C-alpha cells in the first residue's frame, strides 16, 4: 500500500494523461489558480495552497486542448486538502485544480478503460482507494461556513 501512496505523489507521464481524459461536471469550477514554475520538481516544494492562497495569480490554462498540451499531473497528499496540479512543460506553468473533481474524473476515466496493464492497475487501485472510506459528497463549492483544514483555500474563517 505504501507504493500506492508514493505513486500518487509522482508526476503521471504524458502518455497516461492523454490516454485517460478527465471527465468533468460541466458546472463545477475546476481551476483554483496558476503559478509559473521553471521545473515540475518545484511543484513538490511549493507550500500547500491553503497557506499562500492570496499570493497567487488565478486563471484557467490558456490552451484549447488540455490533453494535448498537458505534460503531467501531480497529486500532493501531504496537504490538509489533497492538491492536484496540472503541469504544462512548454508554458512552464502549474495549475492547481479542484482536487475532488479532478481525482474523481481521473478515477472514472481510468476505470472505463478496458485495457489492462501494471501501470493502469496500480493507478486504478490507488485512485479507488481514495474513495473507499469516504462518504458521498458534492463536488460543488462548499456553502458558507467552516471547512476543516481548508479555511483559507475556500476563503472561510473558522471560528
Curated annotation (Swiss-Prot):
Family according to the record: Belongs to the herpesviridae glycoprotein L (gL) family. Alphaherpesvirinae gL subfamily.
Cell compartment(s), UniProt: Virion membrane; Host cell membrane; Host Golgi apparatus, Host trans-Golgi network
Organism (species): Varicella-zoster virus (strain Dumas)
GO process terms (BP): fusion of virus membrane with host plasma membrane; symbiont entry into host cell
Any Gene Ontology CC annotation: virion membrane
UniProt keyword annotations, A-Z: Disulfide bond, Fusion of virus membrane with host cell membrane, Fusion of virus membrane with host membrane, Glycoprotein, Host cell membrane, Host Golgi apparatus, Host membrane, Membrane, Signal, Viral envelope protein, Viral penetration into host cytoplasm, Virion, Virus entry into host cell
Role according to the record: The heterodimer glycoprotein H-glycoprotein L is required for the fusion of viral and plasma membranes leading to virus entry into the host cell. Acts as a functional inhibitor of gH and maintains gH in an inhibited form. Upon binding to host integrins, gL dissociates from gH leading to activation of the viral fusion glycoproteins gB and gH.
Boundaries of every gL alphaherpesvirus-type domain copy: 27-159
Signal peptide coordinates: 1-21
Disulfide bonds: 48-79, 146-158
Oligomer and partners: Interacts with glycoprotein H (gH); this interaction is necessary for the correct processing and cell surface expression of gH. The heterodimer gH/gL seems to interact with gB trimers during fusion.
Descriptive protein name: Envelope glycoprotein L
InterPro entries per the UniProt record, alphabetical: Herpes_gL_N, Herpes_gL_N_sf, HSV_GL_alphagamma
Amino acid at each position: 500500500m505504501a507504493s500506492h501512496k508514493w505513486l500518487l505523489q509522482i508526476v503521471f507521464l504524458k502518455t497516461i494523461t492523454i490516454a485517460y481524459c478527465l471527465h468533468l461536471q460541466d458546472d463545477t469550477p475546476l481551476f483554483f489558480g496558476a503559478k509559473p514554475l521553471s521545473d515540475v520538481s518545484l511543484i513538490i516544494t511549493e507550500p500547500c495552497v491553503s497557506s499562500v492562497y492570496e499570493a497567487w495569480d488565478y486563471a484557467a490554462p490558456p490552451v484549447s486542448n488540455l490533453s494535448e498540451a498537458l505534460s503531467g499531473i501531480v497529486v500532493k497528499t501531504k496537504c490538509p486538502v489533497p492538491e492536484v496540479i496540472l503541469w504544462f512543460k512548454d508554458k512552464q506553468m502549474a495549475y492547481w485544480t479542484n482536487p475532488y473533481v479532478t481525482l474523481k474524473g481521473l478515477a472514472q476515466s481510468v476505470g472505463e478503460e478496458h485495457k489492462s496493464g501494471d501501470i493502469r492497475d496500480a493507478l486504478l487501485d490507488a485512485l479507488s482507494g481514495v474513495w473507499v472510506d469516504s462518504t458521498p459528497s458534492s463536488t460543488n463549492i462548499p456553502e458558507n461556513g467552516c471547512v476543516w483544514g481548508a479555511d483559507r483555500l475556500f476563503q472561510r474563517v473558522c471560528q
